[in-house]
Amino acid sequence: MLIAAASGRALAASARRGGFVPLVADAFGDQDTLAACAGHARVDLMRRPVDGDGLIDALDRLTAGRDCAGIVCGSGFEDGAGLLARVAARWPLLGNAPETVARLKDPLAFAALCRATDIRHPKTAVTPPPDAQDWLFKRMGGAGGWHVRAAQGAKPGRGVYFQRRAAGEPVSALLLGDSRRVLVLGFSAQWAAPLPGRPFRYGGAVRPAPLADGVLRAMTAAIERLNAAVPLTGLASADFLIDGDAFHLL
């Protein structure tokens, strides 16, 4: 099984436990990853733009002379539906289709999806709001909070958008879908580790998140409605802000 991700360690360990022989392309090649996989290539999927040709070449080298069940694409493809399509044209894709990723990572399409499924979602725009004080500036398909900052002074452009601030504590849901049903595996509480100019940088997560039963059921129901509209395949996550009994899906 091929694995391509910013960090492939956890996926490789899971694949090995499942009886697969993982071949990993990631940015680290740490000892734990190398112990779990049968082949490794160093490819930096955190750098933007991603070297798509380099990734394809690395995957070709890993699979040379081997039968491959398919490829699992992890973190690093959040804004890369086009690259995901290139990969899927070469190997069976074990996960969400490029079209699914593109739809869910399009901020206006996702906002419309949340409205259609009755899920609270912060107001979103691709043009600067008249009063930017209560808004954030984000990169489409961004991950890890590095790309999020206050909207004051930010300029519109390709691949960026604006989103109204919402109150609450960050919680992430881990999901597993089979293209029909979705199973919520758990909720984790998150926190930020700010740096100068990067106030929302991801700091870590711990599970389980302390959620009231009613909130947990409502969040699970929201995920199920979303999956009914856009069926998910494989592992995925959904980020929320929890404010008492209310929540926003980000």
Predicted segment positions?
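ATP-binding N-terminal substructure of ATP-dependent carboxylate-amine bond-forming enzymes
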Residues: 1-99, 108-109
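Residues at the starts of beta-strands that form the adenosine-phosphate
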Residues: 21-24, 181, 250
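A conserved helix-loop-beta module that forms one wall/lid of the active-site cleft
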Residues: 89-153
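A short beta-strand motif that forms the metal-chelation/ATP-contact edge
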Residues: 136-138, 175, 246-250
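ATP-dependent carboxylate/phosphate-activation module, predominantly the ATP-grasp catalytic core
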Residues: 164-231, 242
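Flexible, glycine/charged-enriched surface loops at secondary-structure junctions
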Residues: 233-238
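A glycine-rich phosphate-binding loop feature that marks nucleotide/adenosyl-phosphate handling sites
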Residues: 239-246
